[in-house]
UniProtKB/Swiss-Prot annotation:
PROSITE patterns: RICIN_B_LECTIN. Residues 429-551 form the Ricin B-type lectin domain. Signal peptide: none annotated. Heart, brain, spleen, liver, skeletal muscle and kidney. Catalyzes the initial reaction in O-linked oligosaccharide biosynthesis, the transfer of an N-acetyl-D-galactosamine residue to a serine or threonine residue on the protein receptor. Has a broad spectrum of substrates such as apomucin-, MUC5AC-, MUC1- and MUC2-derived peptides. Pathway: Protein modification; protein glycosylation. The chain crosses the membrane at residues 9-28. Substrate binds at residues 156, 186, 316, 347, 352. This is Polypeptide N-acetylgalactosaminyltransferase 1. Changing residue 106 to A: Loss of enzyme activity. Changing residue 466 to A: Induces a decrease in activity. It comes from Rattus norvegicus.
């Protein structure tokens, strides 16, 4: 009996295990089918394994790449090729994982299903294989498949063999149509982008540089804004990819685009008025006066309507401000979409050379945008950069005609309504040199940067570094920097203008010719013997060394 009972227990236990095995087999078989159905039903870009799963390997999750000491010399030599750490880039996978750097409120936003399609246009010239293909793979892996019409790679006359047939063979295997378009000769970013835009088929054109990495959820918020209003031109937050280590660092949603006196693009803090307009919701787009220009999306038809790029501009430089002014002045809107993040390798120097040099090219381009879009404010720019007035800027009649056709607003409207915190002083007592009566020398910013001392040098009468504005707010400005003194008998430093008076408040007496620093009650004096090129403040004595002539610079002769 015992033996029979024991057999029954063994048999029953075995039966339980058999039934359990069958259940598990059927369960996981069905789960696999469900997963297969789920993956087939989702757009390729929504399967986020390549995006969110941490991988092992150099640079994964955006971590910095550390080069061993024994390879440092080779790394330095390779760095010169593209002006970034090529060795580090080649160690990183094309589909490396990146952190989700979006604001928490962005991660739960829901976008319409019927968003427009986009063609992604990427111009390259002698780009590194690894950075170019990492850009392409990040677009494919992190974008809903049905939203990507195509990727258009425009080769601006590259000389490297691997960017010829090997590139064409590689991109044919990708799951998104990728077209390689060749420029017959070196044409520059502007004309190469125009070529890419001309062959694109998507409802939206998205321009990217050739050394970018898109993050999860980058595309939908851009397309959603254009669907909401086709005259809205949108930029992602541009995250920083280190040129030294390829570390991925989130960009700030608290900065927007502006420009300085020399029409150089600059990032500035988002002003309080824009925060108030968004009611403090940082997930809402920021209206930006200008864009950096490398990364943006625009409705394809609208791009044509507002005049694409100025084809009379050469190579690169100034085109971002020109299109920014045009968008705003001609009825469009320019935004930074804070829920979209795209990384960009920021280089300290360019590896490219340009016929005639970059200075000549940028001067020509800036002259064109000033003549067409800046009205009387162009004269302010010419005083700051008199060399611009000497360049041949070509025929602008078609661009002037475009402005009239589109019935665009004046530049004064742009400054008052879109960029009231512009660095261009609209109300001032003087704009020009500040000359010391005793030494006959002029204040000079010496091309120094923020937190450095203002200088004094022989007056040259050519504007540029010796142009200062004594504003209606009683600031002494040189570009976006104001003369600031923080201690008695101290030197005069240049700090960002804060418009709060304090250490940046100066009182000019046109009779005594003194510039009195109000907070300290001392007067601006000539340089001391200890430091012959740095003025300071001293107790007011009425001496000639404390007398200054504020002279308006006359407009240079314009050709």
């Amino acid at each position: 009996m015992r033996k029979f009972a024991y057999c029954k227990v063994v048999l029953a236990t075995s039966l339980v295990w058999v039934l359990l095995d069958m259940f598990l087999l059927l369960y996981f078989s069905e789960c696999n089918k469900c997963e297969e159905k789920k993956e087939r039903g989702l757009p390729a870009g929504d399967v986020l394994e390549l995006v969110q799963k941490p991988h092992e390997g150099p640079g994964e999750m955006g971590k910095p790449v550390v080069i061993p000491k024994e390879d440092q010399e080779k790394m330095k030599e390779m760095f010169k090729i593209n002006q970034f750490n090529l060795m580090a880039s080649e160690m990183i996978a094309f589909n490396r994982s990146l952190p989700d750097v979006r604001l928490e409120g962005c991660k739960t936003k829901v976008y319409p299903d019927s968003l427009p399609t986009t063609s992604v246009v990427i111009v390259f010239h002698n780009e590194a294989w690894s950075t170019l293909l990492r850009t392409v793979h990040s677009v494919i892996n992190r974008s809903p498949r049905h939203m990507i019409e195509e990727i258009v790679l425009v080769d601006d006359a590259s000389e490297r063999d691997f960017l010829k047939r090997p590139l064409e063979s590689y991109v044919k295997k990708l799951k998104v149509p990728v077209h390689v378009i060749r420029m017959e000769q070196r044409s520059g970013l502007i004309r190469a982008r125009l070529k890419g835009a001309a062959v694109s088929k998507g409802q939206v054109i998205t321009f990217l540089d050739a050394h970018c990495e898109c993050t999860v959820g980058w595309l939908e918020p851009l397309l959603a804004r254009i669907k909401h209003d086709r005259r809205t031109v949108v930029c992602p937050i541009i995250d920083v990819i280190s040129d030294d280590t390829f570390e991925y660092m989130a960009g700030s949603d608290m900065t927007y685009g502006g420009f300085n006196w020399k029409l150089n693009f600059r990032w500035y803090p988002v002003p309080q008025r824009e925060m108030d307009r968004r009611k403090g919701d940082r997930t809402l787009p920021v209206r930006t006066p200008t864009m950096a220009g490398g990364l943006f999306s625009i409705d394809r038809d609208y791009f044509q309507e507002i005049g694409t790029y100025d084809a009379g501009m050469d190579i690169w430089g100034g085109e971002n401000l020109e299109i920014s002014f045009r968008i705003w002045q001609c009825g469009g809107t320019l935004e930074i979409v804070t829920c979209s993040h795209v990384g960009h390798v920021f280089r300290k120097a360019t590896p490219y050379t340009f016929p005639g040099g970059t200075g000549q090219i940028i001067n020509k381009n800036n002259r064109r945008l000033a003549e067409v879009w800046m009205d009387e404010f162009k004269n302010f720019f010419y005083i700051i950069s008199p060399g611009v007035t000497k360049v041949d800027y070509g025929d602008i009649s078609s661009r002037v005609g475009l402005r009239h056709k589109l019935q665009c607003k004046p530049f004064s409207w742009y400054l008052e309504n879109i960029y009231p915190d512009s660095q261009i002083p609209r109300h001032y007592f003087s704009l020009g040199e500040i000359r010391n009566v005793e030494t006959n020398q002029c204040l000079d910013n010496m091309a120094r940067k923020e937190n450095e001392k203002v200088g004094i040098f022989n007056c040259h009468g050519m504007g540029g570094n010796q142009v200062f504005s004594y504003t209606a707010n009683k600031e002494i400005r040189t570009d976006d920097l104001c003369l600031d003194v923080s201690k008695l008998n101290g030197p005069v430093t240049m700090l960002k203008c804060h418009h709060l008076k304090g250490n940046q408040l100066w009182e000019y007496d046109p009779v005594k010719l003194t510039l009195q620093h109000v907070n300290s009650n001392q007067c601006l004096d000539k340089a001391t013997e200890e430091d012959s090129q740095v003025p300071s403040i001293r107790d007011c004595t009425g001496s000639r060394s404390q007398q200054w002539l504020l002279r308006n610079v006359t407009l240079p002769e314009i050709f």
